[in-house]
Regions:
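N-terminal beta1-alpha1 ligand-phosphate binding loop
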Residues: 1-19
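Anionic-ligand binding patches
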Residues: 2, 15, 35-211
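Cofactor-binding loop segments of dinucleotide-utilizing enzymes, especially the Rossmann-like FAD-
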Residues: 6, 26, 113
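Flexible, glycine-rich phosphate/dinucleotide-binding loops
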Residues: 10, 30-32, 117
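A local structural micro-motif
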Residues: 21-22, 198
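A short beta-strand-loop structural module common to alpha/beta enzyme folds
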Residues: 22-30
Length: 211
């Protein structure tokens, strides 16, 4: 599989699911369009990343699969919360999220490619998970920011890290989606796209034989 992303978290999730990956980072303009809804934004960016990567390829992947994704943290009240520009920005974001529920949406675009990189099929979807934070004190926010954990993450936190998980009171939806890629949904979409005879069991068989 070709992954059109440099995210170490997406790479880890896919490798844990049994995929051998080739990384193809896609450089696109990620600015939102006027009045574009958050879910429409991530769907569009994922599709543009997939196409940008496809255009750079001279040969299709062995399994024919190319996957691109884009994840945002947002709420109707706060808008889209990107990666912090500095520690103070991270503090402001975490204070705004304190005691509230926000959304994490990931747009995914999957292409089935021929050996000459022609598109044989495609799948596009958006997965959204609701995340609720505990009420955070200023001292708790400062302690978390001091770890450096927020600085490369949308929304200024990482649910998968030992420190970041302590901020989260509850989630409703797919945990992997908050990390960066909704693996269970992706597996089902890939099964439909590739029409493997074993359906959703095919990646699980790969995992069982790898142990």
């Amino acid at each position: 599989m070709i992954l059109a992303s440099q995210s170490p978290r997406r790479r880890q999730l896919l490798e844990e699911a049994g995929f051998a990956l080739k990384i193809c980072p896609a450089d696109i303009d990620e600015a939102a369009r006027p009045d574009e809804r958050p879910t429409d934004l991530v769907r569009r960016l994922a599709s543009e990343k997939a196409e940008a990567c496809r255009q750079m390829l001279s040969q299709g992947p062995a399994d024919g699969l190319l996957v691109a994704a884009d994840t945002i943290v947002w709420s109707p009240e706060l808008g889209v919360l990107g990666k912090p520009t500095d520690p103070d920005d991270a503090r402001r974001t975490l204070a705004a999220l304190s005691g509230r529920t926000h959304h994490v949406s990931t747009g995914v675009s999957a292409l089935l490619l021929s050996p000459t990189c022609e598109v044989l099929g495609s799948a596009s979807f958006v997965e959204t998970t609701d995340v609720t934070f505990y009420e955070l004190t200023e001292a708790e926010i400062d302690a978390y920011v001091t770890t450096g954990d927020p600085m490369d993450k949308a929304g200024s936190y990482g649910i998968q890290t030992p420190a970041g998980r302590l901020l989260v009171k509850s989630i409703h939806g797919d945990y992997d989606n908050v990390v960066g890629l909704p693996i269970p949904r992706l597996m089902r979409e890939l099964s439909r796209l590739t029409r493997h005879s074993n359906g959703i069991l095919w990646p699980l068989q790969t995992l069982s034989t790898a142990k």
